[in-house]
Amino acid sequence: NWSSLIFSLNLQRRILPKPTRKSRIKNKQKRPRSRTLTAVHDAI
């Protein structure tokens, strides 16, 4: 389950436009786990 979730997250990350990606990197520095959890919930 985890590997598939991470794989889907990576796909979403590549699809995202540049500005969103930039803000996401900024948020990742603050709290990578909560950011990932939010993305997972959105995917579900």
Curated annotation (Swiss-Prot):
InterPro entries membership: Ribosomal_eS7
Residue ranges of the region described as Disordered: 18-44
UniProt KW Ribosomal protein keyword: yes
Molecular function via GO: structural constituent of ribosome
Cellular component GO terms, alphabetical: centrosome; cytoplasm; nucleus; ribonucleoprotein complex; ribosome
Pfam families for the chain: Ribosomal_S7e
Alphabetical keyword list: Cytoplasm, Cytoskeleton, Nucleus, Ribonucleoprotein, Ribosomal protein
Origin: domain of life: Eukaryota
Task of the protein: Component of the small ribosomal subunit. The ribosome is a large ribonucleoprotein complex responsible for the synthesis of proteins in the cell. Required for rRNA maturation.
Subunit text: Component of the small ribosomal subunit.
Similarity field: Belongs to the eukaryotic ribosomal protein eS7 family.
Name of the protein this chain belongs to: Small ribosomal subunit protein eS7
Species this protein is from: Salmo salar (Atlantic salmon)
Gene designation per UniProt: rps7
